[in-house]
A protein has these predicted regions:
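Conserved P-loop NTP-binding catalytic core
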Residues: 117
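NTP/phosphate- and nucleic-acid-binding module
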Residues: 1-114, 122, 128-690
Length: 690
């Protein structure tokens, strides 16, 4: 085992700045747990409570910004931040620790089980397994696993971190082929990109493998892991296993098929209950189910996975979105362009996409001695529009816009209705500008994005600023300039954001804007990137006021993300009960009997003349059945037409979400109301589902 740092190498006393508490001079090698339990000066954080609610309980700490176990020895002057269960970091630690307990329970029930990786996710955790003899988990097995997990939690087993060299680490996992592969891959290639459990192997001259050991009553459990973890399993009572799904080792369909168990964990029983209620509501709102129930779209097997076919109502919603997008872009100074769906591969070789993204592209096609590809990105073609002739600074900023369909070969395991498809249409814009124009363009662009998204009834936004990754092209100074400009635009818009270090694209830093839907879920929608690399690759220039050539800056931007994904978001946000301006059928006319058909047809004609999307259900079924059908289709207005209405030129108005129909409404009054509501756009409380 790798030994600790020699005590003689450390100073006798260290200076600690404990955030939120104060500055202290303490003996060296003090641990976080000792700080909490033994130092009376550290007030509110001095007790570790093991009750069911860990919202305010310290689970781990940050030492100079690096997350660590409470058992970690602090051997140098440092800034310390304690992490409680209700923080983002605390929840992640709770979930990852619970994933370990789940793997331990599976190993206890199926002693020959192989366990692969088990990370925390935004809403929970998962772990991938291979059961002996090709066995498969059942729903009943989830209950068995949960029962064993609660026994492990009751034992209050400690999470003990241990470090080994590569050979020792491999020996610990001699019967776990997936852990061995992780250790061996990192040991053989020190430049390997580490993900998941690979980050438990610290590269360098003497690579170190970190593991966590749980001391059980009957046996120990060890797992390859970077950590940190909660001090012991007793902190982990608020969890639920959710479902079983298939997965592939390394996400590669040619590798071993595994079984993935999903679960979630929270800091308190109330937080867990709230999440499970939201999950139940999310299932009711699932756009895949509503897409079928509302006759919006489907995915024919004859066409292939990830390639949706839109039915008339779904195509109408899509058309409304696209028409709205065109309108707001044209009125904001964007210039429309159109580019083909297929292009020569050499274009994407020049842009760098072929080198970096070929695995996500459809295979090449050979035609007339040249290789062609379905386009995965619109940007190289927009660059060709810009470079089709010389440009002057007077033409800048040039904002090019296209509703362009692109094709990406997503693996079948990650396809998810309209939210993850292989053929997607982006409301794609590329802005070419001078350096002086960049800050103003970005500031107005962020404002434009938020204004458009607000039109759809969203008002809770946050952003993520992704910075330079480990593998990138271009100069660091250019990256820093672009990153600073994006950060300034977010600050000017007063939108909260976090920095995702190293998660930018290979050619540009980016902003991802997230919004919160009606049941509190976060969705990523708009993306903005400042690109200093592609203009150089394509030799773009403009003639400045000094008559010299200069290189423009280029901004990539997709506002909806994709039309398909944005439709999925809207379907789930509104549970299919779209605001009036987005509803494929805005008004449904229902005559009480055949004798009212003629007037009902007149009503229908008047509605259509007013520009309202309308339909009629004639009296070939009972009245109640037709009204119920309209409600199931979530039509905003159902007009019931009876004998009194024929004589008085009125209608009976049933508004979605209201249990009280309004009788005897003059037809023209209703038309004026509906036209006014439809023109306002947005999503009001009346538009929310019952």
């Amino acid at each position: 085992m790798v030994t600790d740092i020699d005590k003689q190498d450390s100073p006798q006393f260290i200076s600690l700045n404990i955030l939120g508490i104060g500055n202290y001079s303490l003996p060296n090698r003090v641990t976080g747990r000792e700080l909490l339990e033994n130092d009376s000066e550290i007030g509110y954080a001095s007790k570790v409570d093991k009750q069911g609610d860990t919202s305010d309980v310290v689970l781990a700490m940050e030492i100079d910004g690096e997350l660590s176990d409470l058992a970690t020895a602090i051997t140098h002057d440092a800034t310390i931040k304690f992490v409680n269960g209700s923080s983002v970091e605390g929840r992640s630690i709770l979930r990852h620790s619970t994933a370990h307990v789940m793997a331990q329970a599976v190993r206890d029930i199926w002693p020959g089980a192989k366990y692969a990786i088990g990370p925390a996710t935004e809403d929970g955790f998962y772990y991938d397994f291979e059961l002996p003899g090709g066995a498969h988990f059942t729903d009943a097995d989830l209950g068995r696993i949960e029962k064993r997990m609660r026994e492990i939690i009751k034992e209050d087993q400690s999470f003990a971190r241990e470090e080994y060299d590569l050979a020792e680490g491999a020996g610990l996992f001699s019967d776990q082929q997936y852990k061995l592969e992780i250790i061996q891959a990192v040991g053989e290639n020190e430049s390997v990109v580490v993900t998941g459990d690979e980050s438990a192997v610290v590269n360098g001259r003497n690579p170190v493998v970190s593991v966590y050991r749980n001391m059980g009553v009957h046996s120990d459990f060890i797992d390859l892991c970077r950590g940190p973890h909660v001090p012991s399993t007793g902190y982990l009572g608020n969890f639920k296993l959710l479902r079983v799904a298939g997965s592939y080792w390394r996400g590669d369909e040619n590798r071993q098929q595994l079984q993935r168990i999903y679960g979630t964990a929270f800091e308190s029983p109330d937080a867990l209950d709230d999440y499970l209620k939201r999950l139940e509501e999310a299932e009711k709102r699932d756009h895949r189910r509503l897409g079928t129930e509302l006759d919006l779209f489907h995915f024919p097997s004859e066409i292939g996975g990830g390639l949706p076919v839109f039915h008339p109502k779904g195509a109408l919603i899509r058309t409304i979105l696209e028409d709205f997008s065109r309108q707001v872009h044209l009125s904001s100074g964007y210039l429309p362009v159109w580019t083909p769906h297929v292009t020569k591969s050499t274009l994407y070789a020049k842009s760098g996409h072929l080198e970096w993204y070929s695995d996500s592209m459809y295979p090449p096609m050979e035609m007339e001695g040249a290789e062609y590809r379905m386009k995965p990105m619109n940007c190289p073609m927009h660059i060709l529009v810009y470079s089709s002739r010389s440009r002057s600074y007077r033409e800048l900023p040039m904002r090019l816009f296209e509703l362009g369909t692109v094709y990406r070969f997503e693996r079948s395991g990650v396809l998810h209705g309209l939210a993850r498809v292989r053929g997607l249409t982006q409301d794609d814009a590329h802005i070419f500008c001078t350096p002086d124009q960049l800050p103003g363009e970005l500031e107005s662009l962020v404002g434009f994005v938020l204004e458009v998204l607000t039109t759809f009834g969203f008002d809770d936004f946050e952003a993520e600023l992704s910075t330079r990754p480990e593998k990138f092209v271009g100069d660091i100074s250019d990256w820093d300039l672009a990153t600073d400009a994006l950060a300034s635009a977010l600050s000017a818009a007063e939108i909260p954001y976090r920095v995702a270090e190293g998660e930018g694209a290979f050619y540009a830093p980016k902003i991802d804007i997230h919004l919160t839907d009606a049941i509190g879920r976060r969705w990523q929608v708009s993306t903005l990137q400042v690109d200093l690399q592609m203009p150089a690759r394509f030799g773009l220039s403009y003639v400045g006021d000094d008559n010299e050539k200069h290189r423009p800056y280029m901004v990539h931007r997709a506002l909806f993300g994709s039309v398909e994904r944005f439709m999925a978001l809207l379907i789930e946000h509104y549970a299919g009960a779209f605001p009036l301006w987005l509803s494929p059928v805005q008004v449904l006319v229902v005559p009480v009997s055949e004798s009212h058909h003629d007037y009902s047809e007149e009503v229908l004609l008047r509605l259509k003349e007013a520009g309202l999307r309308s339909d009629i259900y004639l009296a070939d079924e009972p009245l109640g059945a037709r009204i119920r059908k309209g409600k199931l289709e979530k039509v905003p207005y159902i007009l019931v037409v009876g004998g009194e209405d024929v004589d008085s030129r009125t209608v009976g108005v049933n508004r979605r979400g209201s249990s009280k129909p309004q009788r005897g409404v003059p037809l023209e009054d209703f038309v004026a109301e509906a036209v006014s509501v439809a023109s306002e756009r947005g999503g009001s409380e009346q538009d929310r589902p019952e």
